[in-house]
């Protein structure tokens, strides 16, 4: 269902939108927002985000920059991953650091004179 909706938005952008001109108060425009929302979040949630955006785009709104929110993993996904790691004996994100050791990134372990300036 996602791809027919994306095709409808593209059809609107190529045919009707050029006739209306730039009337959206937001960046990106409502049609671009809708395309990104449906592409990123799927047909149901993307359509809901698009409808909410179109309702907010009215003569009384101030407009501005309004990007599509990033896709988040469901809460059960993290719980399942932690349970799987615990069963395999690996470290879990929920476990505290051992003996006060804070894991660092590889960049933090590299001496500063080695890194390019």
UniProtKB/Swiss-Prot annotation:
The keyword Cell membrane applies. Its main location: membrane. GO terms for cellular component: plasma membrane. Residues 87-117 are annotated as: Disordered. It is found in: Cell membrane. InterPro entries: Membr_insert_effic_factor_YidD. Keywords: Cell membrane, Membrane. The keyword Ion transport does not apply. It comes from the Bacteria. It is a peripheral membrane protein. Could be involved in insertion of integral membrane proteins into the membrane. NCBIfam families: membrane protein insertion efficiency factor YidD. Belongs to the UPF0161 family. This is Putative membrane protein insertion efficiency factor. It comes from Streptomyces avermitilis (strain ATCC 31267 / DSM 46492 / JCM 5070 / NBRC 14893 / NCIMB 12804 / NRRL 8165 / MA-4680).
